Amino acid sequence: MLLKYQNNASGNAPSFVRFFRVPGMNHSHGGIATDQFDALKALVNWVEYGQAPDRIIAGARGEGNASDQVNTELPSDWSANRTRPLCPYPLIARYNGQGDSELAEHFSCK
């Protein structure tokens, strides 16, 4: 429903609504995904400080990660410190072609 609204709304929809998909994540967490992120912080920054999120940084929950939960579905070759940007729909994260592919800073929302 949100996607239908966003696709059909006037051009100012991104000024008050953003939808961030998490590739590979199950319903609320887990799956082969970078499923650890703070959407509430992004929302607070938008509502209270006028800083609309253009990306949300997500991490993988794996051995060695600061999280107390371990996502057992992650591939063994993923770094526990893997990060990715979550991009507002319809944009998706694309690797820039240079730098460590485990770090969000080397990806852009396109």
Predicted regions and their residues:
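C-terminal His-loop and adjacent cap/lid subdomain of alpha/beta-hydrolase
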Residues: 1-110
